[in-house]
């Protein structure tokens, strides 16, 4: 008989899953000691924007979006390689356990096997409506002096014209340690602000800010991250994404400018959009719940 999940809804549609990892301290130790040079599978740590470092790709010589079925087939020849393989499998399997429960409890219209009609990828293969991505394993710098390590944002990428493709819908963050100061995640939704300090082994699932899913009344969910001190914060980021057909205006502009030219124009268009619609850097106007 399967044991019931230890899950806490800390705020509407924000769930914390606890106790999923067999030995979170060992997982943390393996990640912390990994330099990408030993006889393991993990790649070296490389720069992650201005926030810190991440392991990219996860495994040496493999792409950065390994599915469970791919990881299960990875051959290992050393004890360290097998340990790294099991770490990744546990992260992936726990993601599935938590997010499938979250999807059911929040009545998300979800079919993992549904195919997008009349659309193929660049190789002519069918496209699934829902795809998961990750994990991206990262660690935050300890010398960020700004009030926020990451400003309030949605993982869903805001666009002036919706492009065709998969969009972030559900975010799942796994936390491997809590031996640091700070590092809280702060949510803004529907005029409320709610701050949570993750504990080692927590798997936090919440809306990515997609305007068609998991709203708080008429409000999307924003989240920001506080800086850490003394020790880095180690975490994994994973997502469920849902395919969008794209706005009619997108295809009208493809016809007008040509596909290649219209694609080349996106960098400047997106920069202008971000400059005119910056992320928030405080929650001063919200009602503080916690």
Task: State what each model feature region is.
Residues 2-123, 127-129, 136, 143, ...:
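Non-heme Fe(II)/2-oxoglutarate
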Residues 4-6, 124-127, 161-164, 176, ...:
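Beta-strand elements of modular eukaryotic interaction domains
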Residues 19-20, 138-140, 155, 175, ...:
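Structured loops at beta-to-helix junctions and adjacent beta-edge loops in soluble globular domains
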Residues 27-33, 92-95, 169-179, 237-240, ...:
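Short, Φ-rich (hydrophobic/aromatic) sequence segments
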Residues 135, 148-149:
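Metzincin-family zinc-dependent endopeptidase catalytic domain
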Residues 139-142, 160-181:
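Short, conserved beta-strand element in jelly-roll/cupin
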Residues 149-157:
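Histidine-centered catalytic micro-motifs
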Residues 166-168, 181-290:
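Catalytic core of Fe(II)/2-oxoglutarate
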């Amino acid at each position: 008989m399967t044991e019931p999940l230890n899950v806490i809804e800390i705020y509407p549609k924000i769930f914390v899953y606890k106790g999923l990892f067999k030995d979170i301290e060992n997982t943390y130790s393996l990640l912390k000691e990994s330099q990408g040079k030993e006889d393991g599978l993990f790649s070296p740590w490389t720069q992650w924007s201005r926030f810190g470092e991440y392991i990219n790709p996860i495994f040496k010589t493999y792409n950065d979006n390994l599915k469970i079925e791919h990881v299960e087939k990875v051959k290992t020849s050393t004890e360290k390689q097998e340990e790294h393989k099991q770490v990744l499998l546990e992260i992936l399997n726990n993601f599935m356990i938590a997010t499938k429960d979250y999807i059911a409890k929040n009545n998300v219209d979800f079919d993992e096997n549904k195919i997008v009609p009349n659309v193929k990828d660049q190789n002519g293969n069918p496209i699934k409506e829902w795809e998961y991505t990750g994990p991206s394993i990262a660690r935050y710098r300890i010398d960020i002096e700004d009030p926020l390590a990451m400003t309030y944002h949605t993982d869903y990428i805001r666009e002036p014209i919706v492009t065709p493709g998969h969009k972030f819908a559900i975010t799942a963050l796994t936390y491997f340690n809590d031996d640091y100061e700070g590092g809280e995640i702060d949510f803004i939704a529907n005029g409320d602000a709610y701050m949570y300090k993750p504990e080692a082994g927590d798997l936090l699932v919440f809306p990515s800010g997609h305007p068609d899913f998991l709203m708080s009344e008429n409000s999307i969910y924003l989240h920001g991250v506080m800086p850490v001190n003394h020790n880095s914060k180690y975490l994994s980021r994973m997502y469920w994404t849902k395919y969008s057909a794209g706005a009619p205006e997108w295809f009208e502009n493809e016809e007008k400018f040509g596909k290649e030219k219209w694609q080349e124009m996106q960098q400047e268009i997106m920069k202008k959009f971000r400059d005119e619609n910056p992320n928030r850097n405080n929650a001063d106007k919200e009602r503080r719940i916690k």
